Swiss-Prot record:
The keyword Ligase does not apply. GO terms for cellular component: cytoplasm. It catalyses: carbamoyl phosphate + L-ornithine = L-citrulline + phosphate + H(+). It comes from the Bacteria. This is Ornithine carbamoyltransferase. Belongs to the aspartate/ornithine carbamoyltransferase superfamily. OTCase family. Pathway: Amino-acid degradation; L-arginine degradation via ADI pathway; carbamoyl phosphate from L-arginine: step 2/2.
């Protein structure tokens, strides 16, 4: 009998149906419960997992590592200086080699095409830990966190504030509308999402009964908001744009004034982290000295407020990544969803 997930890669939200995405979220909640109760779930006993990182990471690396170990697998970290992807060796050749040695591959880097080539040529499941276009494992964690707080997803409204063109905004739009969540992008016109991404999300919204709003008007954006979400103003690889982004995005900061506009005491705040909410880092101090900004995408007040759920969200990276790896590699009996 055909298994729904076995042997499949997890590269972008658009590759999955609503039912499949919901299944992975609910499976993650189940695995989280098993973890909390100390019940072993070694679905990947004896498996070897390659963790390829072109981009640095705290949460993605920690989540994949602990998830693999909890599932009984052995994770092997290969950083930017350990692999030859596209430099001394083609991605195709690297994929074919790694596919002979590992049972599954995680990739976190710049190019979506690269993770797709790894999946095409390795012969094993490949999981996208982040590319410049999509961040699908983050979405499972995000929407699990939302569901934990509201008991549902359909009909809720999520507002993303900031750079509407980045991978997180892309993924929130597509995954949210796929799941029946209304997604608002609150961003300057210069950073509105790409038209093809918006059209894709609108197609999902039509099917799920959700809606999409892209606006630079704060009152319009937060009307009916259940979730406020933000991300860093400058993505990895765009560090030369700091001054421009600080000036452009300051009006889109998540602060208490914006929270109050939403007029929802049950509102939650999410951030995929790291967050620049104070000057308690070398990075934060440097930005404050150069640009006179001590709080960037979110104020410290909101970050530490009763609305904040970002550390729950970060923990959920592990549980949702575990669900993806187990479902695609664990030979689990999932004939339909």
């Amino acid at each position: 009998m055909t298994q729904v997930f076995q042997g499949r890669s997890f590269l972008a939200e658009k590759d999955f149906t609503r039912e499949e995405f919901e299944y992975l979220i609910d499976f993650a909640a189940h695995l989280k419960d098993l973890k909390k109760r100390g019940i072993p779930h070694h679905y990947l006993e004896g498996k070897n997992i390659a963790l390829l990182f072109e981009k640095t990471s705290t949460r993605t690396r920690a989540a994949f590592t602990t998830a693999a170990i909890d599932l009984g697998a052995h994770p092997e970290y290969l950083g930017a200086n350990d692999i030859q992807l596209g430099k001394k060796e083609s991605t195709e050749d690297t994929a074919k080699v790694l596919g002979r040695m590992f049972d599954g591959i995680e990739f976190r880097g710049f190019s979506q095409r690269m993770v797709e080539e790894l999946a095409e040529f390795s012969g094993v499941p490949v999981w996208n830990g982040l590319t410049d276009e999509w961040h699908p494992t983050q979405m499972l964690a995000d929407y699990l966190t939302v569901k934990e707080n509201f008991g549902k997803l359909e009909g809720l409204t999520l507002v993303y504030c900031g750079d509407g063109r980045n991978n997180v905004a892309n993924s929130l739009l597509v995954a949210g509308t796929l799941l029946g969540v209304n997604v608002h992008i609150f961003s300057p016109k210069e950073l509105f999402p790409a038209e093809d991404i918006v059209k894709l999300a609108e197609g999902y919204a039509k099917a799920s009964g959700a809606h999409v709003l892209v606006t630079d008007n704060a009152d319009e954006a937060v009307k009916g908001a259940d979730v406020l979400y933000t991300d860093v103003w400058v993505s990895m690889g765009e560090e030369d744009k700091f001054e421009e982004r600080v000036k452009l995005l300051k009006p889109y900061q998540v602060n208490m004034e914006l929270v109050k506009k939403a007029a929802n005491d049950n509102l939650i705040f999410l951030h995929c982290l790291p967050a620049f909410h104070d000057t308690n880092t070398v990075y934060g101090k440097d930005v404050a000295e150069k640009f006179g900004v001590e709080e960037m995408e979110v104020t410290d007040e909101v970050f530490r407020s009763k609305y904040a759920r970002h550390f729950d969200q970060a923990e959920n990276r592990m549980h949702t990544i575990k669900a993806v790896m187990a479902a695609t590699l664990g030979n689990l009996f999932i004939p339909k969803v």
